[in-house]
From Swiss-Prot:
SUPFAM superfamilies: IlvD/EDD N-terminal domain-like, LeuD/IlvD-like. It comes from Xanthomonas campestris pv. campestris (strain ATCC 33913 / DSM 3586 / NCPPB 528 / LMG 568 / P 25). Its cofactor is [2Fe-2S] cluster; Mg(2+). The gene is ilvD. The lineage of its organism: Bacteria, Pseudomonadati, Pseudomonadota, Gammaproteobacteria, Lysobacterales. Its EC number is 4.2.1.9. This is Dihydroxy-acid dehydratase. The active site is at residue 515.
Length: 612
């Protein structure tokens, strides 16, 4: 049987010094024979999705100790993409994912921890911790801080989220008073922003990967039920330790759970629920860390056969994550996919032997269990707060309408093609990604003249100055992992196009990425990126681009001979922006850019460069 990793620092005469230090942290004689379980928390006062996590690590720790483990908590960094957006702060967002992954690896390996509980929530924190878990491959369970409640105002006939505040602020016809009311109402509580944005998408995907508990992605942060998820996560971590160190059960380890089939399940869920395009980037990165051969071609294949069964803000103002929970949460979406023959239900989870077992226990349309039904009735209280578990409001009824409700069955899907698609063509040889759930059907095939910008900043200025007209394809380049560096989110350009009434009349193509709050014909992750010699760097103003989502194609309508001539010219000039950008690129960002791969590889480090 495998020995506890912690024995390296807790056993033997030569570890007397280490034990002395362990004792100084509070360990007693009897603790040196127990598993040491690291708790990677991510509390910060900078991020609403993490502001309530301060005491939750200790909540998990006490439960771990109650059931026979030793708990040791530490914190990672956490960047708020919404606060970092629109200025050079966004250059740090994606690179922070690698820092988070490294910090978890450093702490766990330096102290020889036996298992790991990841307390994550927002955009780069869950992916960073997921990458670390698959690197380390020790028993791991994820538990998130939970989603924010949707906002409410008398000035709108629907619930609000962050994007509503941004769009109204960019609308010149809106009064200052209306903008202020939306600003004060859009984000009422702690938690990750309330739509199907990147944070919530990733927390939902951990359920499909099998690494978190049912409800992880959907119970609002303020609800008392989420406390039980934290307590149970502590117990599960100890159980996983016993299964691995006591029984050498490979399905107690992340790589035994998050297999190729599990990654297909996660991507299938993402497509079905119209998740953020960023999830593709993060799943590809996690797969590389776990040595799972899951790539863009697999995503392309799945996108052609998986229907969209759930539509949530920003793709519709009607539903937010709290409504997904009321409809049965992720387990109910997985149940509909399973009945459609679209899942690998034999995949393992941290809480059941198979995903089929999990669905059988938790799908509200299949289970006659008052406890399960009560759990999924957990709802918002509508009281602004930054305190976790501070309310116990429940819906009177569940939404089990699978023909017209928030979650649909396959026969009544919002669309028979899913919410994400991968496009290929001469402008993106290795692919690019579009969130089809947010694209009006009238522009699924679109041809337009290019309006080229060398940065997000110049694109924003151009859009606000009315340089962009209906029928244009806005191209924003040199914003990829290397070129940015850091692959900025393009939420402001898409929001401003929307506020200008161009959301259904323009396209946007970039080697950068998009916020989970983006909608419209917004195509990102163009690979290779411009800074790596990608054809997006060869586009000129006035060229034509043809986008055909049904055919999964995107092409620059320029002859091969002309493209070859442009490439020769660009090789001589160097692959860098034409204009000088007033952008401070620090040593830390330069180090990230040096090793970063393009988006089709998840923007992870180029290991070939490290291996020489």
């Amino acid at each position: 049987m495998p020995e506890y990793r912690s024995k390296t620092s807790t056993h033997g005469r030569n570890m007397a010094g280490a034990r002395a230090l362990w004792r100084a942290t509070g360990m007693k004689d009897g603790d040196f024979h127990k598993p040491i379980i690291a708790i990677a928390n991510s509390f910060t006062q900078f991020v609403p999705g993490h502001v309530h996590l301060k005491d939750l690590g200790q909540l998990v720790a006490r439960e771990i100790e109650r059931v026979g483990g030793v708990a040791k908590e530490f914190d990672t960094i956490a960047v708020d993409d919404g606060i970092a957006m629109g200025h050079d702060g966004m250059l740090y967002s994606l690179p922070s994912r690698e820092i988070i992954a490294d910090s978890v690896e450093y702490m766990v390996n330096a102290h020889c921890a036996d298992a790991l509980v990841c307390i994550s929530n927002c955009d780069k924190i869950t992916p960073g911790m997921l990458m670390a878990a698959l690197r380390l491959n020790i028993p791991t369970v994820f538990v998130s801080g939970g989603p924010m409640e949707a906002g409410k105002t008398k000035l709108a006939d629907h619930n609000l989220d962050l994007i509503d505040a941004m769009v109204i602020a960019a609308d010149d016809s809106a009064s200052d008073e209306k903008v202020a009311e939306f600003e004060r109402s859009a984000c009422p509580t702690c938690g990750s922003c309330s739509g199907m944005f990147t944070a919530n998408s990733m927390n939902c995907l951990t359920e499909a990967l099998g690494l978190s508990l049912p409800g992880n992605g959907t119970v609002v942060a303020t609800h008392a039920d989420r406390e039980q998820l934290f307590l149970r996560a502590g117990r599960v971590a100890v159980e996983l330790c016993h299964r691995w160190y006591g029984g050498e059960d490979p399905t107690a380890l992340p790589r035994g759970i998050a297999t190729f089939e599990a990654f297909e399940n996660a991507m299938t869920l993402d497509i079905a629920m119209g998740g953020s395009t960023n999830t593709i980037l993060h799943l590809l990165a996690a797969a590389q860390e776990g040595e799972v051969p899951f790539g863009m071609r697999d995503i392309d294949r799945l996108s052609k056969r998986v229907p969209q069964l759930c539509k949530v803000a920003p793709n519709t103002p009607k539903y937010h994550i709290e409504d997904v929970h009321r409809a049965g949460g992720i387990m109910s979406i997985l149940g509909e996919l399973a009945r459609g023959g679209l899942l690998h239900t034999n995949a393992a989870t941290v809480h059941t032997r198979t995903l089929a077992d999990a669905i059988a226990q938790w799908d509200v349309t299949q289970v006659d269990d008052d406890k399960v039904h009560t759990f999924y009735k957990a709802g918002p209280a509508g009281i602004p707060t930054q305190i976790a578990f501070s309310q116990a409001t429940r819906w009177d009824t569940l939404d089990t309408d699978r023909s017209e409700g928030c979650i649909r069955d396959v026969a009544h899907a919002f669309s028979q093609e899913g919410g994400l698609a991968v496009l290929y063509g001469n402008i993106a040889r290795d692919g690019c990604v579009v969130k089809t759930a947010g694209v009006d059907e009238s522009i699924h095939v679109f041809e337009g003249n290019t309006r080229v910008y060398e940065s997000q900043d110049s694109a924003v200025k151009g859009i606000l100055a009315d340089e962009v007209k209906a029928g244009d394809v806005v191209v924003i380049r040199y914003e990829g992992p290397k070129g940015g560096p850091g692959m900025q989110e393009m939420l402001y350009p898409t929001s401003y196009l929307k506020s200008k009434g161009l959301g259904k009349h323009c396209a946007l193509l970039t080697d950068g990425r998009f916020s989970g709050g983006t909608s419209g014909l917004s195509i990102g992750h163009a690979s290779p990126e411009a800074a790596a010699g990608g054809a997006i760097g060869l586009v000129r103003n006035g060229d034509k681009i043809l986008i055909d989502i049904p055919k999964r194609s995107i092409d620059l309508l320029v002859s091969d001979e002309e493209l070859a001539a442009r490439r020769t010219e660009q090789d001589a000039k160097g692959w860098k922006p034409v204009e000088v950008r007033p952008r401070k690129v620090t040593t830390a960002l330069k180090a990230y850019a040096l090793l970063a791969t393009s988006a089709d590889k998840g923007a992870v480090r180029d290991k070939a460069m490290l291996d020489g």
